[in-house]
Amino acid sequence: AAGQVFATLLLADKSGVALDPSAQDDRFPALNDLEPSSPDQAAMTLGTALFVPSTSNDQRLEPTHRSVAEYLAADWLGKQIDSRGLPLQRVLNLMLGFDGKAVPGLRGLYGWLALKSLKAQHGLIKNDPLTVALYSDPQPMDVEAKKLLLQEIYTQTAANPSVLWDLRGAENLTPLFQAELRNEYLKALLDPKRDDSTQTYVVFILK
C-alpha cells in the first residue's frame, strides 16, 4: 500500500496527503483522490513512520524520506510491470522529459525502477544509463545488466563528454565491479585513445 501511495505522489508531483478537507490543496490531495487499490491499508500506512506532519500544517502528511519513498514506489511499480500487466510506456510517459531522459525530480524513481523491474531493466538502462548508475544500486544486478550499463555509459560519454559533470556526483561505483566484468574494464584502461570521451569514461570506472 505504501508503494502505491508513494508512486502516485511522485508521478503526479504531489508533496503529500491531506488528512482533513480544510488542508487540501493542489500539493496535498486527499488520500481518496490518489485512488489506492486498498484504501484501508493505504490509510493505515499514513499512520506509520513512513510519513511525518508537514511543517506548514499538521493535517498534511509528507514522506519522511524521499529516498525511501522512491525505493518503495519503484518496488511497487516494478511488480505492476513485471506481474500485473502495467505498460512500461504508460509509466515512462510520466517520468521522461522532452529529451527522453528522466526528469530531475524523478531520477531516483527511475534509477530504482531499473533495479526492481526485470522486464523493464535493459530498456531503462539503454535509455538513461547515467541515471541508473547514479540513482540506484547496481550491486544486485546480474552480470549482463552491469555489462550493458557500462557499455551504455561509454556510448553516452562518447557522444557527449560533458556528462562528466553528472558523474561528479558518483561517490562510489564499486558495486559495478565484479570479476566477470574484468575485460570491460581492461578494454577501457588499455584503450590508446586520449580523447575527452575516453578519458571521461576511464574517470568514471575508476571511481
Locations of the language-model features?
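Hydrophobic repeat-domain scaffold segments
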Residues: 8, 16-19, 25-26, 45, ...
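Extended helical regulatory/linker subdomains that flank P-loop NTPase cores
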Residues: 1-81
